[in-house]
């Protein structure tokens, strides 16, 4: 009536000898989006496969999936159409060592070390033309422009501080002669322990001061004369007296 169920053998030999239906299990796996992109590839648009491969590699590098190896496993388990050439997807460590080329090139303003600095400072070349030969070759840099600009300025003359004895002797020499040149200036500079340039500059400044004082004195004298004449005229008008030019002196003879 009822037959006993056959006993199953769970020995190692029976388990190893048993073939697992790999094709069936593979067919039951869920289809992932990456597999759909490979399955839908066609020879009409060969660049689409390369785009999906790069997108999958970038997603793996950013950590979109919990395990980056899943993306590469999908690519292996679902090969694309053999008629269309597909670039292989590099592993994550290769992506880290060799990043994908950026589609945006750096702005030309940031590549200053590769450009001629004279294009940045055209006004400087126009202003200091005699320094133009220095801004050529490997030395052309913004630092060299600023350095040459600072060196191009004429240094300010240091004002000499004369001692009282030196000023006294210079004043005596100026009273004798307002222009000291040649051997006289050289001898005066040597006696005062000064340079000829210092003596020359002092005499130039002293002549300028002398001319200014003379003009001020002449101006003050003319103003005093005008003031005196004005007061005399007012007194004559008030007293109704004639000026000496208007008095006619005649003799009785």
Swiss-Prot record:
UniProt KW keywords: Cell projection, Developmental protein, DNA-binding, Homeobox, Nucleus
Keyword Lipoprotein (UniProt): no
Ranges of Basic residues composition bias in the record: 225-234
Compartments reported by the entry: Nucleus; Cell projection, Axon
Pfam families associated with the record: Homeodomain (PF00046)
GO cellular component labels: axon; nucleus
Chief location category: nucleus
Span list, region Disordered: 213-253
GO BP terms: anterior/posterior pattern specification; brain development; cell proliferation in forebrain; central nervous system development; cerebral cortex regionalization; dentate gyrus development; forebrain cell migration; neuron differentiation
MF (Gene Ontology): DNA-binding transcription factor activity, RNA polymerase II-specific; RNA polymerase II cis-regulatory region sequence-specific DNA binding
Ranges annotated as DNA-binding: 155-214
Transmembrane segments: none
Family membership noted in the UniProt record: Belongs to the EMX homeobox family.
Oligomer status and interactors: Interacts with translation initiation factor EIF4E.
Function in brief: Transcription factor, which in cooperation with EMX1, acts to generate the boundary between the roof and archipallium in the developing brain. May function in combination with OTX1/2 to specify cell fates in the developing central nervous system. In the inner ear, it controls the distribution of GPR156 at hair cell boundaries, and regulates the organization of stereociliary bundles in opposite orientations across the line of polarity reversal (LPR).
The protein's name: Homeobox protein EMX2
UniProt organism field: Bos taurus
